[in-house]
Amino acid sequence: MIWTRAEGCRVWDENGREYLDLSAGFGVAALGHRNPRVMEAIASAPVAHALGDLADAHVTQELRRRLPWPAKLGVTGEDAVEIALRTALLAKGKPGIVAFDGAYHGTGLLALAATGFEHFRAPFTAWLPGPVHRRAYGEDPGPLPDDAGCVIAEPVQGRAGARVPPVGWLEQLRERCDETGALLIVDAIYAGLGRIGELWPGEDVADVICVGKALGGGLPLSAALFVRRELERAWHLGPEDVLTHTHVGNPLACAAALVVLDEVPKLLRRVRAAGARFAEEGWQGAGLLRARAGDAQAAERSGVIVIPAGLDGSLISATPALTISDEELDEALSRLRRTTDAWSRSS
């Protein structure tokens, strides 16, 4: 399918067919496609240059001021994870990573090593760094290995199918980290910025929170947020930044992010209410990060876009715009109900 137009929670293909989009581009379009405030912010951004890395634009500095903790910016979610993992090595001097089955942290080699999907890792095993100690998601990892500089976990797993850990699990990880001095990294790239009804999931326990996807309002932007503020100093290694990219802090993305930070807090109650509607229909997860058994292609034929998900690919995932209306949600769920009922009968 080729999208030729997108507005809010609806997209149109090259044949002019309209779809209800429950993917929001893997959660990126949290305020809806072509959100008017985001579009206006991009169009009117006081951009003196298009680069991000050479020097901060004023709008980039404003974003840094608006974030609740010191931040090292990236372009992709994977960048934020790489920053967080390298922070642990710099701060603790230990290369070991404790990660979890079903985790998805990115496909760069360091983030990939921590990712829990074997089919992503297998072609590149010879190059993957480590050691990585893999544990069962949602369970007590036990005493951490001596070489572990950090634990990295998602507050709700996205690609694995909206897996929600038991209440208190992140606090349990915090206790395990405190036993050895390891850092706790919360990868909230998918679940953060309102997706599960919280702005900064894990903020009470994390040393570093990774955010991305929704942050740039549709443009590429991510950040590793140093909740433990002194960790920022781990990167004071000399006159030149040793981990950067050409477009870090791109002013257009930063202008869009300022709108996201304005608007998402107003939507948290709405997210929880809409999430309850999904739960009534048998969708697991939290907020507007949801999954259930189903067929993404069948859903597409019914005019609804969802994402294949799950450890074995047998689930469909819904991550709609946080702005989805009751009418759009009812329409999408009605179509999906017929689709999943038919899929269940044929399975």
Regions found by a protein language model. Give the residues of each.
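Conserved N-terminal phosphate-binding loop of PLP-dependent enzymes in the Aspartate aminotransferase
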Residues: 1-347
